[in-house]
């Protein structure tokens, strides 16, 4: 992939447009900054709602598994 020459600043400003990452490292760095930005209420709300929804989904889908039941073929 061709890398772009757009500079990436460590601290984003409020009126900065989101960038499109050109590789996995930039994408992971963006996810990390998204998850650890303590000053952005909207991002924190989205992140918390997403984590809550993932927890609800896991609880609903894993509730039918009986870990104490005898396993087939053992």
Swiss-Prot record:
Positions carrying N-acetylalanine: 2
Keywords for the protein's UniProt record, in alphabetical order: Acetylation, Membrane, Mitochondrion, Mitochondrion outer membrane, Protein transport, Transport
BP terms from Gene Ontology: protein insertion into mitochondrial outer membrane
Locations listed in the record: Mitochondrion outer membrane
Source organism superkingdom: Eukaryota
Region (Disordered): 1-22
Biased composition (Polar residues): 1-16
A GO cellular-component term linked to this record: mitochondrial outer membrane
Chain segments annotated as transmembrane: none
Chief localisation class: mitochondrion
Database matches in Pfam families: TOM6p
Complex formation: Forms part of the preprotein translocase complex of the outer mitochondrial membrane (TOM complex) which consists of at least 7 different proteins (TOMM5, TOMM6, TOMM7, TOMM20, TOMM22, TOMM40 and TOMM70).
Family listed: Belongs to the Tom6 family.
Name this polypeptide is given: Mitochondrial import receptor subunit TOM6 homolog
Organism: Homo sapiens (Human)
Gene: TOMM6
